[in-house]
UniProtKB/Swiss-Prot annotation:
Upper lineage: Bacteria, Pseudomonadati, Chlamydiota, Chlamydiia, Chlamydiales
UniProt record, GO biological process: negative regulation of DNA-templated transcription
Protein's organism: Chlamydia pneumoniae (Chlamydophila pneumoniae)
Gene Ontology MF terms: ATP binding; DNA binding; zinc ion binding
Cofactor or coenzyme needed: Zn(2+)
Record's cofactor remark: Binds 1 zinc ion.
Protein name: Transcriptional repressor NrdR
InterPro entries on file: ATP-cone_dom (IPR005144), NrdR-like_N (IPR055173), RNR_NrdR-like (IPR003796)
Function per UniProt: Negatively regulates transcription of bacterial ribonucleotide reductase nrd genes and operons by binding to NrdR-boxes.
Zinc finger (unnamed): 3-34
Length: 152
């Protein structure tokens, strides 16, 4: 690692802390040449392979997960902090699995689990895209299962 200010390669760590909200270790560093201080975050590299619907494999990309969450939660009470928290929870659950190959179905189900707790509108929006409903009946099944108190 190099100093972002002078590109010198010798640094010392001043402070280290867990940053559980980011699933990371936060380190305060100081350059031994220019004495500038800066913060770095060390995270676990996610090496999951995602099995797509068409049979291809792709590296897991948290940015795609966040994009999907943003689309589903647009104009709802879910803010960016909660979007990132949901993405972090999904990522943590995926990392906790023994298998490093995960299907888009498993990812989608995890996202739906968290969205259902957070906001029903975001949950329904995500379900519409993720489940690719073929007719209104399929959508009605999700609506009725999402609102168990509603009369059928």
């Amino acid at each position: 690692m190099q100093c972002p200010f002078c590109n010198h390669g010798e640094l010392k760590v001043i402070d280290s802390r867990n940053a559980p909200e980011a699933n990371a270790i936060k380190r305060r560093r100081e350059c031994l040449k220019c004495s500038q201080r800066f913060t770095t975050f060390e995270t676990v590299e996610l090496t999951l392979q995602v099995l797509k619907r068409d049979g291809r494999y792709e590296n897991f990309q948290e940015s795609k997960l966040i994009h999907g969450l943003n689309a589903a939660s647009s104009h709802t009470r879910i803010g960016q902090d909660q979007v990132h928290a949901i993405a972090s929870n999904v990522k943590s659950e995926l990392l906790g699995k023994q298998n490093r190959e995960i299907s888009t179905k498993e990812i989608g189900e995890l996202v739906m689990k968290y969205l259902k707790k957070a906001d029903m509108i975001a949950y329904i929006r995500f379900a519409c895209v993720y489940r690719r409903f073929k007719d209104v009946g399929e959508l009605m099944e999700v609506l009725l299962s999402a609102t168990p108190d509603m009369e059928k």
